Regions:
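Bacterial N-terminal signal peptides
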Residues: 11-22
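N-terminal secretory signal peptides that target proteins for export/translocation
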Residues: 1-8
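Sequence context surrounding c-type heme c attachment/ligation sites in exported
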Residues: 24-32, 117-396
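Histidine-centered active-site/metal-ligand motif
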Residues: 3, 74-77, 201, 279
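Conserved small-residue
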Residues: 27-90, 96-110, 116-122, 129-176
């Protein structure tokens, strides 16, 4: 029996039951207070049948302007708040109410042989199970005491995802849609454990609480199709639904994928989302003295002509974080281009190198001028995207 046939057989009864229930009552998501459901289905976020995984109509699909890279996985992100609750905008950040449930489902398109396909994510609002493989769904829920992170791993039949607080791994083989002649890549996809979830979602160490990284005000300024079909900024969708009291003021966030922008702005936007949650003055990587949020005060704090202080062997025997005009001599480029566990950055969330991201950082460093032999921070700071005044707060 094929993978799809087995899934169809196992979910036929479930689909029939859901149809019967739909005729009797409207299915709505559930907020489970101070508990950890073992099955993803207990949250009632999705309609799952033999053809697709689709968020319920009352659940909003969201997409951050600058997504995190996770081994070229596609992601379906959702947001839901209990009826009668509303988030507040406080200092341009969203303060979500107790009961808010965020989810992010990681999946890949697959070919007939079961290989996962490296292809651009088109931002689908549902997942077609006939040509996709579900890997994991991460749930971030706002409890009374703060945010709680729950990793759920999908079974092989794609009928249910189960809580795995210790994480998991999945061996995968990836082919590239744009170049079929490229040899397939075998790698291990790692589902983070509970502590690793906390490590990234806690941007103020050691005593700060977890919070979202993508579903924040600055990352939701991009336009998207809402559940009602309207194409508008996602923040305005939340306000229209009554889920947010007001929209933040100011321009939309730069996207690192927007090739019409100057290379410096794109590079800062990329580093902010991929690295800024740790590399900020209060983050887990504060001992490095490296600020990659885009809110650096000097070029040196961004890494220009800055010697490493906490990189260990991960520096690749290089002298400076960024050497203007020379990416091959820059530790920043070296670490994002590495896939070795003791060298790569980010150190969690990937097994593969984000080739497009590395190319962006390489091009940007190549445009920088100046010399580390004659470093002048005031001279370098205003060049090629280092101007602190143009930086925006883009991570929580």
């Amino acid at each position: 029996m094929t993978h799809s046939a087995l899934r169809a057989f196992l979910t036929k009864g479930l689909a029939s039951t859901l149809l019967l229930l739909a005729g009797c009552t409207e299915v709505t998501p559930s907020f489970v207070a101070d508990a950890r459901p073992q099955r993803l289905s207990e949250w009632n976020l999705f309609d799952l049948n033999t053809q697709r995984l689709q968020p319920l109509p009352v659940v909003e699909v969201v997409k951050p302007t600058n997504p995190l890279f996770t081994d070229y996985a596609h992601k379906l992100r959702t947001l839901w708040m209990p009826e009668g609750t509303q988030a507040r905008l406080v200092n341009d950040e969203i303060d979500y109410p107790v009961g808010t449930v965020l989810s992010k489902t990681f999946y890949y398109p697959v070919d007939d042989a079961g290989n996962v396909i490296r292809v651009a994510n088109q931002g689908a609002r549902e997942i077609n199970l006939a040509d996709s493989r579900l890997i994991e769904t991460r749930v971030l829920v706002r409890q009374e005491a703060g945010w709680d992170a729950l990793p759920y791993v999908w079974n092989e039949e794609e009928t249910e995802a189960f809580l795995r607080v210790a994480g998991a791994s999945r061996p995968l083989t990836m082919v590239t849609a744009a170049s079929p002649e490229t040899p397939a890549t075998q790698f291990a996809y790692f589902v983070p454990n509970e502590n690793q979830c906390s490590g990234c979602h806690t941007t103020e160490h050691p005593d700060g609480g977890m919070h979202p990284l993508g579903a924040i005000a600055s990352q939701l300024t991009a336009s998207s199709h809402s559940a009602s079909g309207e194409f508008q900024p996602q923040i305005e969708t939340l306000v229209a639904r009554g889920w947010l009291d007001r929209a933040p003021q100011g321009p939309a966030l730069d996207s690192y994928e927007d090739t019409s922008l100057p290379i410096g702005q794109r590079a800062l936007a990329y580093l902010n989302m991929q690295c800024g949650h740790c590399h900020n003055p209060d983050g887990a990587a504060d001992t490095s003295g490296l600020v990659l949020t885009g809110r650096h005060k000097t070029a040196v704090s961004m890494g220009v002509c800055k010697p490493p202080v906490a990189a260990g062997g991960g520096a690749g025997d290089l002298q400076y974080g960024i050497v203007p005009g020379d990416p091959d001599s820059s530790i920043l480029h070296y670490r994002v281009a590495s896939a070795k566990p003791d060298e790569m950055m980010p150190e969690l969330g990937r097994s593969l190198v984000h080739e497009e991201g590395v190319a962006l950082i390489r091009e940007w460093i190549g445009t920088l001028t100046g010399s580390c032999d004659e470093q002048s921070d005031s001279r370098i700071a205003g060049e090629s995207g280092f101007e602190p005044s143009v930086a925006k707060k883009t991570t929580g």
